[in-house]
Amino acid sequence: MVEPMNQSSVFQPPDRQRVDERIATTIADAILDGVFPPGSTLPPERDLAERLGVNRTSLRQGLARLQQMGLIEVRHGSGSVVRDPEGLTHPAVVEALVRKLGPDFLVELLEIRAALGPLIGRLAAARSTPEDAEALCAALEVVQQADTAAARQAADLAYFRVLIHSTRNRALGLLYRWVEHAFGGREHALTGAYDDADPVLTDLRAINGAVLAGDPAAAAATVEAYLNASALRMVKSYRDRA
């Protein structure tokens, strides 16, 4: 068994709400901090439950989440063995990396998002149907009617789901959703990017115009421009809340 590093004060009792998720987050943070390096074994359930101030049933549910994320592997006779987080792509692991590594890693994640932009725009302009055009206009209207930053943020996410659906590329949809899900519960830290409605609406209207005109080049450029601009606003919002 590989002995983990100092563990005595790493844990704080999780909030009572959604205890299993809080347990998973606490242990995941310890893993990412190197308290439990790859190949090491987590402490016995009784010890972990005592340190976290939770019962063993809740602890097992939290450990099950970690196993689902791929951060640990349960081996009979050996306990919960830590896997290498750098080899994992589960959105919850990526979200944990954003939480631990901060703005620099968020920038890297948003670079992936922006890189998908030209393909999204090009395919949407080439493949969208009249039904897609109607759905895009309806989604844009929801963004226009949003009267708070949080509502605008939610409407923007919904707009892009409609836009990506119009590409008729399921793999692209899965990739974009992976990036979106990687933000996990951190969306609130990015809401400030939607405080000013004008740049959001201006760019989304340009995307709509290019897609509905069936202009792949213009659509590719407008989607990429919007994702790059919104990424800058998101990083600023994230840093302002740090």
UniProtKB/Swiss-Prot annotation:
Record domain HTH gntR-type: where: 17-85
One GO MF term attached to the UniProt entry: DNA binding
Record InterPro entries: GntR_C (IPR011711), TF_FadR/GntR_C (IPR008920), Tscrpt_reg_HTH_GntR (IPR000524), WH-like_DNA-bd_sf (IPR036388), WH_DNA-bd_sf (IPR036390)
Residue spans binding DNA: 45-64
Sorted UniProt keywords: DNA-binding, Transcription, Transcription regulation
Highest taxon, organism lineage: Bacteria
Signal peptide (residue range): none
CDD domains: WHTH_GntR (cd07377)
Record protein name field: Uncharacterized HTH-type transcriptional regulator Mb0505
Source organism of this protein record: Mycobacterium bovis (strain ATCC BAA-935 / AF2122/97)
